[in-house]
């Protein structure tokens, strides 16, 4: 079981490296790692388990965050009342198209690898299309908008050595871009 001690923190060199593409089929160890990443998210969202093991709640985890420089992410976004939830373990995900319109979270973004609160708006594409493989090597294509699009972009950034705060405008950190939508 992964815990917070398995998650590397800001400043660790792996978080700034471009992660390696995975060859398919995945090895047994790679599959186990991806399943453990998803399990961390499930546990982190369970109040009792999170309290018992000191887990910070998360909706996404990228392999570089557990010091594995490979292009794998797990995303688990619970239903917010809209009837939609997102539960994916993706291999070699790529954003293949995106909107011009930007979106941002009014409270900014957080990260399991960043212990401090970083003030500032993170502008991302409001709509994206992702192509990836699932854990068994099957093709997946996702069209995402709003909050899920933001979460997936955050995790894919980790695969490219990019941290969320890299997107914050240093001169005007709390100023929304023109035409950007608040999510």
From Swiss-Prot:
Pfam families: Pep_deformylase. InterPro entries: Peptide_deformylase, Peptide_deformylase_sf. Its EC number is 3.5.1.88. It comes from the Bacteria. GO terms for molecular function: metal ion binding; peptide deformylase activity. One of its GO terms (biological process) is translation. Its cofactor is Fe(2+). It catalyses: N-terminal N-formyl-L-methionyl-[peptide] + H2O = N-terminal L-methionyl-[peptide] + formate. The active site is at residue 155. Keywords: Hydrolase, Iron, Metal-binding, Protein biosynthesis. Binds 1 Fe(2+) ion. Fe cation binds at residues 111, 154, 158. It is an enzyme of class 3 (hydrolase). Belongs to the polypeptide deformylase family. Removes the formyl group from the N-terminal Met of newly synthesized proteins. Requires at least a dipeptide for an efficient rate of reaction. N-terminal L-methionine is a prerequisite for activity but the enzyme has broad specificity at other positions. This is Peptide deformylase.
């Amino acid at each position: 079981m992964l815990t917070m001690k398995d998650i590397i923190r800001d400043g660790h060199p792996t978080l700034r490296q471009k992660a390696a593409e995975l060859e398919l089929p995945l090895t047994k160890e790679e599959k186990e790692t991806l399943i453990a990443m998803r399990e961390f998210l499930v546990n982190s969202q369970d109040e009792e388990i999170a309290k018992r093991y000191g887990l910070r709640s998360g909706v996404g985890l990228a392999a570089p965050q557990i010091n594995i420089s490979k292009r794998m992410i797990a995303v688990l976004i619970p239903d917010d009342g809209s009837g939609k939830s997102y539960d994916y373990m993706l291999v070699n995900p790529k954003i293949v198209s995106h909107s011009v319109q930007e979106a941002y979270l009014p409270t900014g973004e957080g990260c399991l690898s960043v212990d401090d609160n970083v003030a500032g708006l993170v502008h991302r594409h409001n709509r994206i299309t992702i192509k990836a493989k699932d854990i068994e090597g099957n093709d997946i294509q996702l069209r995402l908008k709003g909050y899920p699009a933001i979460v997936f972009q955050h995790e894919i950034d980790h695969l490219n050595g990019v941290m969320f705060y890299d997107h914050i405008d240093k001169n005007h950190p709390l100023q929304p871009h023109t035409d950007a939508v608040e999510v």
